[in-house]
Swiss-Prot record:
Family statement: Belongs to the flavin monoamine oxidase family. FIG1 subfamily.
Record localization: Secreted
Residues annotated to bind FAD: 61-62, 81-82, 89, 103-106, 269, 465, 472-477
Native species: Ophiophagus hannah (King cobra)
Catalytic activity, EC: 1.4.3.2
Name the UniProt record assigns to this protein: L-amino-acid oxidase
Cofactor: FAD
One Pfam family named in its UniProt record: Amino_oxidase
Amino acid sequence: MNDFLLLLLVLFLGVPRSENHVINLEECFQEPEYENWLATASHGLTKTLNPKKIVIVGAGISGLTAAKLFREAGHEVVILEASDRVGGRIKTHREDGWYVDVGPMRVPQTHRIVREYIKKFNISLNPFRQTDENAWYLIKHVRQKMSANNPENFGYQLNPNERGKSASQLFDETLDKVTDDCTLQKEKYDSFSTKEYLIKEGKLSTGAVEMIGDFLNEEAGFHNSFLISVMDHFLFLNNSFDEITGGFDQLPERFFKDMDSIVHLNSTVEKIVHINNKVTVFYEGLSTNMRLVADYVLITATARATRLIKFVPPLSIPKTRALRSLIYASATKIILVCTDKFWEKDGIHGGRSITDLPSRVIYYPNHDFTNGIGVLLASYTWYSDSEFYTTLSDEKCVDVVMDDLVEIHNVSKDYLKSVCGKHVVQKWALDQYSMGAFSTYTPYQITHYSQMLAQNEGRIYFAGEYTAHPHGWIETSMKSAIREAINIHNA
């Protein structure tokens, strides 16, 4: 049993139910080594007396974090990055007078490792408001302010004991039942999809499940392992968030500034040969094929990108199966750049509106630009909701979300076209380097694959958000990098 799953079992068997049924499960999901990783982020690795030659594949935040630790400890490091920039899925679109984060856009208060690096680099933060009572629900053709807090208006067919409760309350109560009654092994909880658990164990009505899917935006992820939904739900429920003032790309750029000489951009790794105590990395640069010989290799590319590399000898069958089986979520952001911040006429400043229309979730800006422009995340979707947009042109995507905004904000489409003349569309499923937005697990995959995905193969090590928990966060990428930096440093 790996440490993560052991913690889950301890969580379900040993955490008492609070009076308000609100348990900070995020802390329970932290690995036992977390405080050590945080200390390493703060103070670095010990100085080495035996410098190693290390090649890192990928200049995303995981690769950059590991490289910084290695260099400061005295190791010789080279990073090979296939694209023409650093940061990976941390990506900020910039134009004159405004910017928008098309990748990560918030940092939870509990993510102390990423905050440690933000502090080290003296990067400023400002609050990211997750909710605003003046924002809207538009679900089942019913439009209602969030402040109304009256779910019965939406006409879900609920059991008597479910009526008058919010979607969050209904979800929380299914978790309280697990905490109170669970005597089962970890495999049972990983064996459920979220929807299956809510119906079979939570004993919720079809209407209650639909309500959770709509209001908590869980519907597109109902196929995930129930444990993934637990982690996501409580991370958002019990957290405050911040954003990086001026754009998230500042974080990888600060890493890059300190070690630009060791980062080789436009360098695609094609083959890795592991013989005895040396690893040879073959890669294609802009004009020629090259190779590097190293003592160790750390692969921080996504699982899908890793499958494009030829390994000699091949990776083990269990490792290959885990990489092949891992699911990657699609995610799409559709951004409108507006000269009139029409949402402020509704009293909305930050937060989000939620709808069952294709837009699903609309996030309002938490910062202003001196030129008065408002940059609206008019649709943020993932899983099947995101796949809806994949084959559409950017112009059609914008047309769809404008239709939704007409209904949500009671404005005309002609008005929206006149004030929101620019747009940005990011479809992570089509990104040729990440090949998806973030990893996730379907039932049984935590049990079967989580440990193997993080396991090294001889002198080849693996890091990235898919090798740790919870998936899809900068913090996860960083702590996986620290984990493997320690392992290689001590090897």
